[in-house]
Amino acid sequence: MPVTVKMLVQKVKLDVVYATDNLLSKEITTSDISRPGLEMTGYFDYYAPERLQLFGMKEWSYLTQMTSHNRYSVLKEMFKKDTPAVVVSRNLAIPKEMVQAAKEEGISLLSSRVSTSRLAGEMSYFLDASLAERTSVHGVLMDIYGMGVLIQGDSGIGKSETGLELVKRGHRLVADDRVDVYAKDEETLWGEPAEILRHLLEIRGVGIIDVMSLYGASAVKDSSQVQLAIYLENFEAGKVFDRLGNGNEEITFSGVRIPRIRIPVKTGRNVSVVIEAAAMNHRAKEMGFDATKTFEDRLTQLITKNEVSQ
């Protein structure tokens, strides 16, 4: 989905100094943000006009020391048709030459009360997430104790029903059936629902239910980091499953690897409780508490003790 200036204004809560509907619908194609430096001296080699242009205290201070004619000339040269918008931080007084150049070149002029560094961070965070390439995967994404858990498995194995049970147990639904995942950076994976499926769960025999309407706003979440994958598979006698928890299976989405746990599904087995335990155990491991390692250490000590006693 294209990212527009209007979306940036709404998400980062920017004030519109000058813009039209057409200008607000202009697409932003890169998450890079430029803070003009040498450009204000008239040096425009390697200038990237397709980036958002951010003016902070330093840039504003330099502009105010220029004559009105020079200020207009520099800004006129800087504001190109490809430039999606110009943003001024700290509610700084915007020179009339900047407004004039923006109107003449057809560029949205925006303002914010927050500091330049914070504003740059907020805009970069939004643009990085919005412009990242999406990959659609089949499954149910849940927020369990603050951890994003992607539940996958064969069709009809009960992923959505498990998600519903987890919602009833106080956890939050992020996406059902189709999960759009993207890499926020090299080590961080995020997931969100397709817009048409937001807050919806499909339960065989019941149909589509609106989780937010039935269980309230606390039962849903718009997006979540994906930290653990759970794969549900039918229990088969003789098939080997990890019983100690020392398996290191991983799965890769959008270039990011996350751990995956396979859970056998069998009649009478409370899968939602098992998934809760898996999520809590994974978090404990990340905090340095590994029950498997503790057991192995105890076993080693017991074996050593028995050998000595003999």
From Swiss-Prot:
One Pfam family in the UniProt entry: Hpr_kinase_C
Additional detail: Both phosphorylation and phosphorolysis are carried out by the same active site and suggest a common mechanism for both reactions.
Catalyses which reaction(s): [HPr protein]-L-serine + ATP = [HPr protein]-O-phospho-L-serine + ADP + H(+); [HPr protein]-O-phospho-L-serine + phosphate + H(+) = [HPr protein]-L-serine + diphosphate
Important for the catalytic mechanism of dephosphorylation as annotated region, ranges: 264-269
Domain notes: The Walker A ATP-binding motif also binds Pi and PPi.
Keyword Transcription assigned: no
Region (Important for the catalytic mechanism of both phosphorylation and dephosphorylation): 201-210
Species classification: Bacteria, Bacillati, Bacillota, Bacilli, Lactobacillales
Active site (UniProt): 138, 159, 177 (proton acceptor), 243
EC number assigned by the record: 2.7.11.-, 2.7.4.-
Cited InterPro entries: HPr(Ser)_kin/Pase (IPR003755), Hpr_kin/Pase_C (IPR011104), Hpr_kin/Pase_Hpr_N (IPR011126), P-loop_NTPase (IPR027417), Ser_kin/Pase_Hpr-like_N_sf (IPR028979)
Family: Belongs to the HPrK/P family.
Keyword check for Glycoprotein: no
Cofactor section: Mg(2+)
Subunit field text: Homohexamer.
Sites where the protein binds Mg(2+): 160, 202
Chain residues that bind ATP: 153-160
One Gene Ontology biological process: regulation of carbohydrate metabolic process
Alphabetically ordered keywords of this record: ATP-binding, Carbohydrate metabolism, Kinase, Magnesium, Metal-binding, Multifunctional enzyme, Nucleotide-binding, Serine/threonine-protein kinase, Transferase
Protein name as annotated: HPr kinase/phosphorylase
One MF annotation (Gene Ontology) recorded for this entry: magnesium ion binding
